Amino acid sequence: MRNSWLGAGVFAAGLGLAMILACGGLSSAGPAATASPAFWKVWGDGKAELSGYAITTTRYGVPREGRVVLIYVTEPMDRRNWIKDDAGDVPIEERVNVLKLNNVLKFQTGIYPYSVMTSVFAPVDTLAAERFAPAKIAMGAQEWCGLVYEKVIPAPQAFTSELRSYFHAEGDRDATVKTPPGTLYEDALLIQLRELDGPFARGKSWAGSIVPSLWSQRKGHTALGPVAATIKREDATRDGLPVTRFTLSYGSVVTTYDVEKAAPRRVLGWKTSGGDEAKLLKTTRLPYWQLNAPGDEKYLKELE
């Protein structure tokens, strides 16, 4: 992973966004607005923000204790395939700067562990109705029975999905699912609700369609598709800190997210009607991809 080029030079890359076509949920008219200098002052520093959480999550009808790490970092991607521009040689008109979120969940079920990672790639410039609309979402889940991988590519009025599963009933499946204009994706809310470069839903409550998280659909073995939803916002406090509380509701599902009002506007925790509850432990900024030498395990203490 290389992010050292980000910074002042990143504004030049934004010029290429005007040539983006209507794919991956992005507007063919190019960016309505580019990310602000204040955004890049934080997110162009060549580091990632890492936040560790303690979580209780329900699996097989039983509460399980686990850990979540949310990893936020900016990086360049090739819009032609939504793969990272590792070599730095993608033509500028094809390069899109994204804020990537890796949501890593680990917990134990009896003898065997679960490891789930969901990656969200959200262009930092305004290319859709809502800021940080995802261009790509991918989820991988591993446990001793086998593994599952699913990828979703949003488009303005549909999304395409690829599912690769060890379950015979699912197997390998590709699909295109229609979505109403302005559809949100639950997996991207942990970026969007932080309001890192402007208010979510213009600072108001929201109503529309949302695609539930890939992991929630994985657990329920249900088809992925848009559902009617609302997101209510209100002022609240959490452990004495002022927060914006967002309440997502669709069907019988209710999830609340508490986002601190002060910078860096971290997600202090969330709670679901299904029994999940996460609480922030610590946050740090590190170039984690460089910390792979023996002894670098010490940095894990910055997340506990």
Give the location of each predicted region.
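Positively charged n-region of N-terminal signal peptides that target proteins for export
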Residues: 1-4
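Bacterial N-terminal signal peptides
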Residues: 9-22
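Signal peptide processing junction and immediate N-terminal pro/mature segment
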Residues: 22-31
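Acidic, serine/threonine-rich low-complexity disordered tracts
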Residues: 30-162, 198-304
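Surface-exposed beta-loop interaction hotspot
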Residues: 156-157, 163-199
